[in-house]
Amino acid sequence: MSKASTFSAPKGIPDYVPPQSAEFVAVRDGLTRAARLAGYGHIELPIFEDTGLFARGVGESTDVVSKEMYTFADRGDRSVTLRPEGTAGVMRAVIEHSLDRGQLPVKVSYAGPFFRYERPQAGRYRQLQQVGVEAIGIDDPALDAEVIAIADAGFRSLGLDGFRLEITSLGDDTCRPQYRELLQEFLFALPLDEDTRRRAEINPLRVLDDKRPDVREMTAGAPLMLDHLSESCKAHFDEVLAHLDALGVPYVVNPRMVRGLDYYTKTTFEFVHDGLGAQSGIGGGGRYDGLMEQLGGQPLSGIGFGIGVDRTVLALEAEGKSVAPPARVDVFCVPMGAEAKAALVKIAHQLRANGIRVDLAYGNRGVKGSMKAADRSGAAVALVLGERELEEGVVVVKQLATGEQETVPLDQVVDKLGDLVEH
C-alpha cells in the first residue's frame, strides 16, 4: 500500500508557529497599542466581500483589482473576493451600520489577514498580515497628522528606528482634473506599450507607480501633482507638515510618490525601510475624501493606513532586533506519580486563575525528561512533587535560573508563587 500523501501550506501562504509566532504577535500588538491610546475602537471585518465593493472602491485600473484579487463564485453564484485591503470594507461597515450618523470622526482599528495573488518573496505573501486604522468624517490636517503619528509611534514602540516617512499630496477634485490632462499629454507623447497606454487613459497616476525600469526612466520628467495643487490643497498639506513638525515626527517630502490604490486624495504617505531592499515599504496610507460617497454613503472624508506585520518583523530582523516576547509560561509542574499529577493539575488550575501562566509535564517522561521540558519551557520556576512531598503536604519550588530550591506547604504555594513570578 502506498504511503498517504502529505499536505503543505499553499504557495505564498506562511504558517506562524511557536516560538517564532510569539515575535509576530508581539509586533502586531505593538503596532495596535498606539491606536488604542488615541481612542480607536476595534472593528472586525469579513474575510470576503462582494467583488463590486473592491472594484468600485479600490479602482478597476489598479493592479490589485485587475491582477491580484482572489475572486470566485460562491454556491449562490455570487461573485465574492477575499479582502485585498481594509479601507473599502471599513467604509462599507460604517455606512451599513450608520456609524457616520453618530459622533465624528469614526475612529477604528483592525488587524488580520488580507489576500493578494502576487509573486511570493521575502515579506511579500499571498496572505499578508496587516494592522490598520481609519478616521472617518472630519477633514482636518491635525487628524491627518494624528493618524501618521500613530503609525510612527507604533514602529518606535517596537524599537525600530531605521525607517523613514515619505509624504506628498495628491490633490483633490479641484486640481486633479487639470493635472490629469497635463500628465496624459506628457504620457501620450511617450512610446508606451499598449497596456501602459490603456492605464494612462483610465488613471495616468497608475503609470507613475510602474516599477519597470524603462517606464520609470521615460516618466522621470513627468509633471508632478505637488507643483499643481490648488490653494486649499496646498494649505492643507502645509498644515499637515506643520503638525508633524510640532509632534516631532520626521518626514521626507517625495513628490513622485504614488500609492497603489485609486481612492487616495490630498495627504498620501508611505513608511519605508532600506534594510528590505527594493521592496522597502512597510506601511502607508492617505486621505480618501470621495470614497464614502462613491460607495453610496454621505460625502464624508477619511484618512487611514495599513502596516504590514510581516514586513515589520523583517525590518526588525534587518536591524538585528527582536521584540523580546515573554516566556511561554511562568511555572512548570513536574509530577512524580499519578497522585502527584492529580495534585499538580489542581494547583496549576488555581495558579492560572490567579493570572500565572502554568504548564505541566504530561505523559510518563520521568524526572529527568520532565526537568528538561521545564528548562525548554522558559519558565522561571518548577514545581516538583513526589510521593514523599505528598505525604508531608509540601511541594518543591525550584528556581530554574539558579537551581535554588525550597519546600513550601501545598496550601501556601499559590501565594508563594504570586510573590516569586514577575509579570
Curated annotation (Swiss-Prot):
UniProt catalytic activity: tRNA(His) + L-histidine + ATP = L-histidyl-tRNA(His) + AMP + diphosphate + H(+)
Molecular-function annotations in GO: ATP binding; histidine-tRNA ligase activity
One GO CC annotation: cytoplasm
Primary location class: cytoplasm
EC number: 6.1.1.21
Name this polypeptide is given: Histidine--tRNA ligase
UniProt record similarity statement: Belongs to the class-II aminoacyl-tRNA synthetase family.
Species in which this protein is naturally found: Rhodococcus erythropolis (strain PR4 / NBRC 100887)
Assembly and interaction partners: Homodimer.
Gene designation: hisS
UniProt cross-references to Gene3D superfamilies, sorted A to Z: Anticodon-binding domain, Bira Bifunctional Protein, Domain 2
Keyword entries, A-Z: Aminoacyl-tRNA synthetase, ATP-binding, Cytoplasm, Ligase, Nucleotide-binding, Protein biosynthesis
Keyword Cell membrane in annotation: no
Alphabetized InterPro entries for the sequence: aa-tRNA-synth_II, aa-tRNA-synth_II/BPL/LPL, Anticodon-bd, Anticodon-bd_dom_sf, His-tRNA-ligase, HisRS-like_core, HisRS/HisZ, HisRS_anticodon
UniProt cross-references to HAMAP family, sorted A to Z: His_tRNA_synth
